[in-house]
Amino acid sequence: MPNLIILVFVGGAFGAMCREFIMLSVPRLADGFPMDIFVANIIAAFLLGLTTSFFKKDKINQYVHLMVGTGIMGGLSTFSSFVFGAVEMMKNPTEVLVSICYLVASLIVGFIAVELGLMIGPKEKPKDPQVASE
């Protein structure tokens, strides 16, 4: 059990460093749209879908899934910053519409990113009907 926690911890630290790199590299747009947080969350959503697909098809073991899926993707994505950014934008009456667009776009594009990750990952092999009937 402690080894699993260490894997998540190390993955989370690496994911947080990746998030900080993205936040330093991706500029905020002039209208206040937090593109840096949006990009980090969408990348994490896609990679979590992909990692989960590999895990479900037994292409990676539980240790890799915990370190990458829970640790790295958990450290990379940032729900608290997502919500905080939206709340801060809503304090400015001229940015309310941008804030709503940010929230909706994050959910829709995040959903699509997870689905793409799952679709790109390994596919389940169809079960052999003769094996099932024996």
From Swiss-Prot:
It catalyses: fluoride(in) = fluoride(out). It comes from Yersinia pestis. HAMAP family: FluC. Belongs to the fluoride channel Fluc/FEX (TC 1.A.43) family. Its main location: membrane. The chain crosses the membrane at residues 4-24, 35-55, 67-87, 100-120. It is a multi-pass membrane protein. The keyword Transmembrane applies. It comes from the Bacteria. GO terms for cellular component: plasma membrane. Na(+) is not transported, but it plays an essential structural role and its presence is essential for fluoride channel function. This is Fluoride-specific ion channel FluC 2. Pfam families: CRCB (PF02537). Keywords: Cell inner membrane, Cell membrane, Ion channel, Ion transport, Membrane, Metal-binding, Sodium, Transmembrane, Transmembrane helix, Transport. Fluoride-specific ion channel. Important for reducing fluoride concentration in the cell, thus reducing its toxicity. It is found in: Cell inner membrane. Na(+) binds at residues 74, 77.
